[in-house]
Amino acid sequence: MAESPQNLVGPQVRRLRIEAGLSQEALAAKLQVNGWDLSRAGLSKIEAGLRRVNDAELWVLAKTLRCQLTGLYPSKPANVSSVVRNGGK
């Protein structure tokens, strides 16, 4: 079985960042202004689905990207059924 990503929001963060015309460096700087000390490398890992994002971080992302929390999630995540079947493991 293919390993599922550690987060579902990464691709949407990347899409919203690009739509806002921001580089990873610029978004990381804006996140830092809003209270999240995140490097460009950390943001890259989030966008790639390799780093988890906790609840507080989701709020900062939504605020910084000027979107609703629901805007950070895909409309239909591809791997939800496997996560549910495996008990989130």
Segments from the language model and where they lie:
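Short, charged recognition helix plus adjacent turn
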Residues: 2-3, 63, 70-89
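Residue-level detection of the helix-turn-helix DNA-binding "recognition helix"
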Residues: 6, 18, 32-33, 48, ...
